[in-house]
Curated annotation (Swiss-Prot):
This is Uptake hydrogenase small subunit. InterPro entries: Cytochrome-c3_hydrogenase_C, NADH_UbQ_OxRdtase-like_20kDa, NiFe-Hase_small_C_sf, NiFe_Hase_small_N_sf, NiFe_hydrogenase_ssu. [4Fe-4S] cluster 1 binds at C62, C65, C160, C194. The gene is hupA. Residues 1-45 form the signal peptide. Its EC number is 1.12.99.6. It catalyses: H2 + A = AH2. Belongs to the [NiFe]/[NiFeSe] hydrogenase small subunit family. Heterodimer of a large and a small subunit. It comes from Rhodobacter capsulatus (Rhodopseudomonas capsulata). It is an enzyme of class 1 (oxidoreductase). It is found in: Cell membrane. The lineage of its organism: Bacteria, Pseudomonadati, Pseudomonadota, Alphaproteobacteria, Rhodobacterales.
Amino acid sequence: MSDIETFYDVMRRQGITRRSFMKSVRSPQHVLGLGPSFVPKIGEAMETKPRTPVVWVHGLECTCCSESFIRSAHPLAKDVVLSMISLDYDDTLMAAAGHAAEAAFEETIAKYKGNYILAVEGNPPLNEDGMFCITGGKPFVEKLRHAAEGAKAIISWGACASYGCVQAAAPNPTQATPVHKVITDKPIIKVPGCPPIAEVMTGVITYMLTFDRMPELDRQGRPAMFYSQRIHDKCYRRPHFDAGQFVEHWDDENARKGYCLYKMGCKGPTTYNACSTVPLERRRHFPIQSGHGCIGCSEDGFWDQGSFYDRLTTIKQFGIEATADQIGWTATGLVGAAVAAHAAVSVLKRAQKKNEEA
């Protein structure tokens, strides 16, 4: 891989000064939640390590992961694609098409065998020998297996590749299957979401480039740095939940006041993702901030978990102490009763305080 330029080489060729280069290093440092002491290490990695070859393939999907990725602000998607990595194949973003694109695919996986990262967006359908998704004249599942043979690691972008998403929802007529159930002999990083957060996607790539290893994963194979806490734990509407203040109808006064959306079906208490932290840092909206509850799109099988507007009744407890590894899918309890009791206690305490003050 010595013939591949480093990120710093590309920046210098574009006329970027070293001072500006070191400033650019701070964006991934913030996204990854690393302290200032890591800036030199990230800088050294980007200055000395060759850009990582990436092969990005698409199965059954809507391309929302790519749409999210190109909107990354820290770092910018253009810096990732044109400077940090060597994106040698992506049939959505590349200029080549048809036979030229497939030739580039074969050349890349042969030239960088054992050194490239395989990024998978979408999943392979297995019914009818994979004929429900054809790419390059062949079933996508064949292309996936072929590309995975020489990959050093695989990234499953989005809910489709990680868990199956809508195309795998019951009765799943195409037998759409998550990547990890088809490829079982390679390390796989799941980055679920529909779509995943842009900065989470670029953050995973930056981490792998900087430290030359996979990030720490939780028991479901997701990067713990982004998927270790529930959206509910850091939600800006959490104080309203604790105070027993809930939206009862979409057009009521409580909705206009920005109260908690739990009773409207918000899945934040059981969904592990960075939605309630990363978007706020970018000053951009996420569903809860726009007035709609979380639908749990980064959790396994969320399409088959009932209506997006049904109130949750199967979470274990409240608080920010538990992580995905500690409770995850085993969480149980009568949440409806717990919320009612919690709200009642909150109201009684406020009433008691007012009486004491009076």
